[in-house]
Amino acid sequence: MTDPSAHSAALTYGSYLALDELLAAQRPRSEEHDELLFIVVHQVYELWFKQVVHELTWLQERLHRGEGGHALATLKRVLTILKTVVAQVDVIETMTPRQFTAFRSRLEAASGFQSAQFRVLEAMLGRRDDRMLAPYPPDGPGYARIAAAMAAPSLFDSLLRYLATQGFETPVVPEPRPAGWRQPSEAVQRVLLEVYRADGEAALVCERFVDLDEGVQEWRYRHVKMVERTIGDKPGTGGSAGARYLRSTLFTPAFPDLWAVRGAL
């Protein structure tokens, strides 16, 4: 005879995806119809950020091993996810300023500025700024993850390591890095010129890095325009500067050398 308890414990679609917990994680703080959409969209963003960080960690491992083909496949996946993240802005923009204002006060100090996963992503892209740690308690997981990401090699550091495995003489990156985003380096650009002139797999990997940088910048632009059309120049929730801060993040490349070298190709 079949054991009934064994049947009840069998893996199902719902249990594998933890759907009971997942679908119970939306807890609106008002009776406003549109608040659920706001929560769902932002939770989906966090899931995508988790996947992007997961993929970029894998990407760095492949680059360190000199596996250009696997790196290209992983970058393609990340770029496709970023397109999905950007397209999601269309959904949140179906909410009018009046609809958002109806429940905005219920957010209290909660703000997207506090997204630890996005700060980890920024650190992986190369941002080195202790101000990113300010919103998080020092003994909390968010603080630890961001600090660890800032202490680890950035994606561009990993790209340089990959280029070294392909026979290119890459300059040593000084540690600790200056605060902020990576600054252009003529020594790095000379190496990149060699890479592009060789026109091999390494050049393709560099081009996908340009796509990654562009994809993140596209997300930033769509995000700031969404905030502007929803709350204008009002301060963000939690006392953040809102659209004004977001505008300050536009057009700052994560990989400036890959952009600077293009004029010499």
From Swiss-Prot:
Keywords: Dioxygenase, Heme, Iron, Metal-binding, Oxidoreductase, Tryptophan catabolism. InterPro entries: Trp/Indoleamine_2_3_dOase-like, Trp_2_3_dOase. It catalyses: L-tryptophan + O2 = N-formyl-L-kynurenine. Binds 1 heme group per subunit. Its cofactor is heme. GO terms for molecular function: heme binding; metal ion binding; tryptophan 2,3-dioxygenase activity. Heme binds at residue 223. One of its GO terms (biological process) is L-tryptophan catabolic process to acetyl-CoA. Its EC number is 1.13.11.11. The keyword Iron applies. Pfam families: Trp_dioxygenase. Substrate binds at residues 38-42, 104, 237. Pathway: Amino-acid degradation; L-tryptophan degradation via kynurenine pathway; L-kynurenine from L-tryptophan: step 1/2. Gene3D superfamilies: 1.20.58.480. Homotetramer. Heme-dependent dioxygenase that catalyzes the oxidative cleavage of the L-tryptophan (L-Trp) pyrrole ring and converts L-tryptophan to N-formyl-L-kynurenine. Catalyzes the oxidative cleavage of the indole moiety. PANTHER family: TRYPTOPHAN 2,3-DIOXYGENASE. Belongs to the tryptophan 2,3-dioxygenase family. This is Tryptophan 2,3-dioxygenase. The lineage of its organism: Bacteria, Pseudomonadati, Myxococcota, Myxococcia, Myxococcales.
